[in-house]
């Protein structure tokens, strides 16, 4: 086998191993770090929804 054949085989081996590495599930190092900020982002829409429900109840009285 000549050098070009070996290089082609090496290329495909590296390509396949790279795809296998990408298929592994990644561990989330900072799983709960952004949770507080995530919850804070939802407080405002919830407050708006509560205000809309209150105004709807007042309107229907």
UniProtKB/Swiss-Prot annotation:
It is found in: Secreted. One of its GO terms (cellular component) is extracellular region. Keywords: Secreted, Signal. Expressed by the venom gland. Its main location: secreted. It comes from the Eukaryota. Residues 1-18 form the signal peptide. Belongs to the non-disulfide-bridged peptide (NDBP) superfamily. Long chain multifunctional peptide (group 2) family. This is Venom protein 22.1.
